[in-house]
């Protein structure tokens, strides 16, 4: 775990910095069409059997160590050993935030609650002035979270996602 990634807590959630030990749980939950269809096309599909481990080991954890990104596992306070999703913040001019929630936990407001915690961290702790989130136009659930947070649409462009354009 990178020292610059704190554990964050909300009313119902614990956001814990990811570690290689999280890879098996992430691997079990992540490679589902309902989750990956709205993600950038660079996410391999079908998802490889070691996809979570490779991503954590080769991409996420090194970015955390360099101070370029913050990756958390999302867990319920009442069951902190069970990973239910993941959420990320990244520095730079592009996409600053991304998240996914396992199918069994979708529709309960967990993504919105995790996003609220990250908004506070991004603006208050990191001192950032702008948060950009990119999403597939058909990703209604993610769009609703952004609207609830007071975000506004500033641009549209054609992009390729796992599920197409």
Labelled PLM ranges:
Residues 2-4, 58-62:
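Short, P/G- and charge-enriched loop/turn segments at secondary-structure junctions
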Residues 1-38, 71-165:
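Acyl-donor (CoA/ACP) binding surface of acyl/acetyltransferases
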Residues 36-58, 70-72:
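Conserved GNAT-fold acetyl-CoA-binding loop/helix
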Residues 63-67:
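Soluble sensory domains of the PAS superfamily and closely related sensory modules
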């Amino acid at each position: 775990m990178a020292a610059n990634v704190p554990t964050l807590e909300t009313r119902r959630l614990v956001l814990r910095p990811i570690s290689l030990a999280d890879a098996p749980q992430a691997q079990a939950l992540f490679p589902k069409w309902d989750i990956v269809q709205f993600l950038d096309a660079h996410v391999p599909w079908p998802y490889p059997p070691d996809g979570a481990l490779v991503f954590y080991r080769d991409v996420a954890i090194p970015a955390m160590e360099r101070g370029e990104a913050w990756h958390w596992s999302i867990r319920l306070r009442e069951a902190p050993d069970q990973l239910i999703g993941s959420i990320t913040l990244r520095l730079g001019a592009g996409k600053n935030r991304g998240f996914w929630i396992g199918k069994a936990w979708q529709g309960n407001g967990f993504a919105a609650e995790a996003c609220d915690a990250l908004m506070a961290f991004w603006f208050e702790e990191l001192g950032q002035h702008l948060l950009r989130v990119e999403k597939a136009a058909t990703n209604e659930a993610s769009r609703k979270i952004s609207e609830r947070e007071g975000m506004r649409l500033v641009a549209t462009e054609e992009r390729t996602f796992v599920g197409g354009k």
